[in-house]
Swiss-Prot record:
EC annotation from Swiss-Prot or TrEMBL: 1.6.5.2
Binding site for FMN: 8, 14-17, 65-68, 105-108
Quaternary structure and partners: Homodimer. Interacts with KefC.
BP term (GO), one: potassium ion transport
Protein name: Glutathione-regulated potassium-efflux system ancillary protein KefF
Cellular component terms per the entry's GO annotation: plasma membrane
Alphabetical list of Gene3D superfamilies matching this protein: 3.40.50.360
Domain of life per record: Bacteria
Membrane-topology annotation of the record: Peripheral membrane protein
Length: 176
């Protein structure tokens, strides 16, 4: 099962993430959990989140990039759900062998994240990749949609279809 952990503080403002979720939602064996819908008070049900994670083969962290990082509720979710003895540390093997895909949208262009005057995209992904590896997850190359503030609808739809294809290809290769 593909589990999409979706974290957008203002989902009604997001055209890119909406289209990504619409495309992903057409696939079989996909569950989408919208953190800001489930936990508007930031009171995360850790047991429920761990249970659904245990059923997933591919975990997707999907969100808009905010200040070169994840939205606050996704960070809190990581802190609360990825616990010692469950996700890492002695006895913490619940996520071992599962795959993780970082699916991120940005307002800036891809060149905005080039090495030089701005941190490179590879650098920005390091904390998430380190978290994944620490929990025994297999890190997959990220999926990024750039320039989402200025893209026309046709471009957003095309990129959302690429996202769906990425998930479908993973399912076909991994029988997930």
């Amino acid at each position: 099962m593909i589990l999409i952990i979706y974290a957008h503080p203002y989902p009604h403002h997001s055209h890119a993430n909406k289209r990504m979720l619409e495309q992903a939602g057409t696939l079989e064996n996909v569950e989408i959990r919208s953190l800001y819908h489930l936990y508007p008070d930031f009171n995360i049900d850790v047991a429920a989140e761990q249970e659904v994670l245990s059923r997933a083969s591919l975990i997707v962290w999907q969100h808009p990039m905010q200040w070169y990082s994840v939205p606050p509720l996704l960070k809190l979710w990581m802190d609360k759900v990825l616990t010692h003895g469950w996700a890492y540390g002695h006895g913490g093997t619940a996520l071992h062998g599962k795959h993780l895909l970082w699916a991120v949208t940005t307002g800036g262009g891809e060149n905005h994240f080039a090495i030089g005057s701005h941190p490179g995209f590879d650098v920005l992904s390091q904390p998430l990749q380190a978290t994944a590896l620490y929990c025994g997850l297999k890190w997959l190359p990220p999926f990024a949609m750039h320039c989402t503030f200025i893209c026309d609808d046709d471009t957003l739809q095309a990129q959302a279809r690429q996202y769906k294809q990425r998930l479908l290809t993973w399912q076909e290769v991994n029988h997930g």
